Amino acid sequence: MWQRITVVAGTVPPRQSHYTFRYEPMFELLPPLNDHNLPWMDTIHPIVVHFVIAMGLITFVFDCIGIFARKPALFEVSFWNLLFATAAIFVAIIFGQVEAGLANPYGASSDILNLHSTIGWSLAGILSAMSAWRYVIRSKDPKQLPLPFLGAGGLLSALIVVQVTLGNQLIWVYGLHTVKVVEAMRAGLV
């Protein structure tokens, strides 16, 4: 990303450009980084992602209760939870990618962060596909839910739990974006 291009006219050999381009990075437009190595007060990704976690897991819970307790009204609730989880995961990913880029991972945290990012994007695709599938199911008969969809919801829930575990490791084991780790990195200790 570049702020501007400065064109300097000059004499150059024939058949070459008459202009020299100088690129200046746009980093000077960003606010300074704080104690957490972020341009804003604290990490936003974990705040947004908690909505995705809650809505993704409660969707499966409502589907199970709806099927086994024969309460089809819960299918409508789980559909809307799934839809909002799908929208929210993209917001979580955007903030997660920015914050991951500013994290300066070290050691094994780099591999965990890469896996966490990959699974996050995969979850976005899976949630989108499941929302579309659920919309088709709901359009045909809103009071029925096929067991294969319930199985897919169970696998989605398991993947969410794995993703939560990886995110917890990044914060509670490796301390990415915590003040002490950022201070140690800035001092060259990590």
Question: What do these predicted ranges mean?
Answer:
Residues 5-25:
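Short, Lys/Arg-enriched N-terminal segments with co-localized hydrophobic residues
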